[in-house]
Amino acid sequence: MFEQCRDHIQITACDGTSLVYHQRTYAFLLFGVLTHYLRWPPERAERHVAERMDNEIPPTSVDAVGNSHDGVYHQAMLLAYGEGYWWEDNEYNSAEPADFDAWWCRYTAQHGLEGDFIEFL
């Protein structure tokens, strides 16, 4: 799953700043949020995440920083419900669930993923 993605991608921006992007970890985290919190079937979640990740091959610093700025939960909700899902007149809650950090730690450990998906150097 997510063979097009890999971890430990070093990216240097135009201004010379560098980061390490764990794109495979990020893809699996999106998949995990969609299947765990939204109860999407794995096939549906995999298809949506793979399509999204295809748009950042090869990944840029803008992709990595943008993903880290909004967070995995928010990005998964965008993938599921689209832009504006957090507006008050929608039924979707934009807040991370109370158990999100604990879930993240368990999920990354269970699946042999990096602890986070971005490292600023």
Label for each model-derived stretch:
Residues 1-121:
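C-terminal alpha-helical interaction appendages
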